């Protein structure tokens, strides 16, 4: 085969590879019960943008992606557990033979019915944790008590046998606690901890977050449950 023909064949193979959809991210809502200082989506209790897609719309997206060969989906937000259609979408994804179904959550919202849905459908969990220290974690989320809720629900996930991984964002406010936080999480039975950095978009683009130093804020900024 001539070099030019071989190069064209390789290029054609690359193009076919690009036509294959491997992973689908579905942002179900911009709403969130927390107001994390570094949030790239600027999510919060009063979201900047309204939800425009219905559960039926997301079902169609799952179906279209499956028809293109996609076999992995992650439900994100905002906080995806606030979306009432999440259980229905998870069930539909499994019916469409998605092999990997993951929910990326802050871990504060986990009623028994939702936990049962996760277990019944073999859902993988990705959970944001910012520190082993409750004060540091709550300073990032802007919600006193959020650390307690997240850790409690992480323990419930582990006991239920769910596959759990942690997204640990390294910031100046927590940089001295990263190793301690990893050890703390391993003590809960969670080995899969991925350390990440802030994104310089949304609230993450503000000066405090660019250097990774979200502050606790005034009493008006830090809410309680």
Which positions does each model-derived feature cover?
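Radical SAM enzyme [4Fe-4S]-AdoMet core and its adjacent flexible, acidic
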Residues: 1-4, 116-225
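Conserved alpha-helical substructure of the radical SAM core
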Residues: 1-122
């Amino acid at each position: 085969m001539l070099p030019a023909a071989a190069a064209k064949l390789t290029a054609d193979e690359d193009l076919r590879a690009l036509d294959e959809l491997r992973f689908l991210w579905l942002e179900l809502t911009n709403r969130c019960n927390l107001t994390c200082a570094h949030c790239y989506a600027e999510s919060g209790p009063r979201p900047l943008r309204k939800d425009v897609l219905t559960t039926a719309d997301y079902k169609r997206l799952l179906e279209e992606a499956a028809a293109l060969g996609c076999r992995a989906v992650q439900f994100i937000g905002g906080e995806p557990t606030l979306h009432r259609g999440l259980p229905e979408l998870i069930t539909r994804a499994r019916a469409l033979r998605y092999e990997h179904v993951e929910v990326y959550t802050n871990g504060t919202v986990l009623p028994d019915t939702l936990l049962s849905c996760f277990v019944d459908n073999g859902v993988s969990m990705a959970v944001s944790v910012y520190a082993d220290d409750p004060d540091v974690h709550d300073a990032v989320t802007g919600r006193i008590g959020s650390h307690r809720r997240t850790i409690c629900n992480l323990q419930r996930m582990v006991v239920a046998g769910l596959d759990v991984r942690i997204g640990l964002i390294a910031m100046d406010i927590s940089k001295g606690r990263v190793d301690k936080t990893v050890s703390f999480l391993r003590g809960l039975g969670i080995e899969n901890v991925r350390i990440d950095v802030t994104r310089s978009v949304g609230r993450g683009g503000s000066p405090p977050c660019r250097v990774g130093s979200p502050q606790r804020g005034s009493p008006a900024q830090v809410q309680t449950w």
